[in-house]
Amino acid sequence: MSEEKPKEGVKTENDHINLKVAGQDGSVVQFKIKRHTPLSKLMKAYCERQGLSMRQIRFRFDGQPINETDTPAQLEMEDEDTIDVFQQQTGGVPESSLAGHSF
């Protein structure tokens, strides 16, 4: 008998991972992406699907802004991780001046 190791649970660098993109409206869109693919591909696909412009929204992972050149591998993303989407604030008062106010 040959001693082949099971492939289960073994991660290779070319693996795809499933990422969820959660909008402020509660919607969740799932994407499958390679670990070394720039996240700009996912971001653009999300915008097209939701009818949004890249200028209108911001993507964050673990509270940190995501750059278009970032990859899941660089951000140490794992399968089923969630990216949060926020509407870009245009005009109005800066967020810092809203601190301490409840609406």
UniProtKB/Swiss-Prot annotation:
Tell me which UniProt keywords the record has, alphabetically: Cytoplasm, Isopeptide bond, Nucleus, Ubl conjugation, Ubl conjugation pathway
| Molecular-function annotations in GO | protein tag activity; ubiquitin-like protein ligase binding
| Compartment annotation | Cytoplasm; Nucleus; Nucleus, PML body
**Record's comment on post-translational modification:** Polymeric chains can be formed through Lys-11 cross-linking. Cleavage of precursor form by SENP1, SENP2 or SENP5 is necessary for function.
SUPFAM superfamilies registered for this protein in UniProt: Ubiquitin-like
Question: Renumbered to this chain, where is the cross-link Glycyl lysine isopeptide (Lys-Gly) (interchain with G-Cter in SUMO2)?
Answer: 5, 7, 11
* Propeptide position ranges: 93-103
- Annotated Ubiquitin-like domain ranges read 15-92
Under the cellular component aspect of Gene Ontology, which terms does the record hold?
Answer: cytoplasm; kinetochore; nucleoplasm; nucleus; PML body
The entry's stated outcome for residue 33 to A is: Impaired interaction with USP25
What tissue expression does the UniProt record report for this protein? Expressed predominantly in liver.
Where's the Glycyl lysine isopeptide (Gly-Lys) (interchain with K-? in acceptor proteins) crosslink?
A: 92
Q: Which residues cross the membrane?
A: none
Q: Kindly give the InterPro entries that the UniProt entry links to this protein.
A: Rad60/SUMO-like_dom, Ubiquitin-like_dom, Ubiquitin-like_domsf
Locate residues linked as Glycyl lysine isopeptide (Lys-Gly) (interchain with G-Cter in SUMO): 11
Q: Which Pfam families match?
A: Rad60-SLD
Biological process (GO), any one? negative regulation of DNA binding
Subunit annotation: Covalently attached to a number of proteins. Interacts with BMAL1. Interacts with USP25 (via ts SIM domain); the interaction sumoylates USP25 and inhibits its ubiquitin hydrolyzing activity. Interacts with SAE2 and UBE2I.
The family this protein is said to belong to: Belongs to the ubiquitin family. SUMO subfamily.
Which PANTHER family does this one have?
A: SMALL UBIQUITIN-RELATED MODIFIER (PTHR10562)
| Function text | Ubiquitin-like protein which can be covalently attached to target lysines either as a monomer or as a lysine-linked polymer. Does not seem to be involved in protein degradation and may function as an antagonist of ubiquitin in the degradation process. Plays a role in a number of cellular processes such as nuclear transport, DNA replication and repair, mitosis and signal transduction. Covalent attachment to its substrates requires prior activation by the E1 complex SAE1-SAE2 and linkage to the E2 enzyme UBE2I, and can be promoted by an E3 ligase such as PIAS1-4, RANBP2 or CBX4.
Q: What is this protein called?
A: Small ubiquitin-related modifier 3
Organism of origin is: Homo sapiens
Q: What lineage is this protein's organism placed in?
A: Eukaryota, Metazoa, Chordata, Craniata, Vertebrata
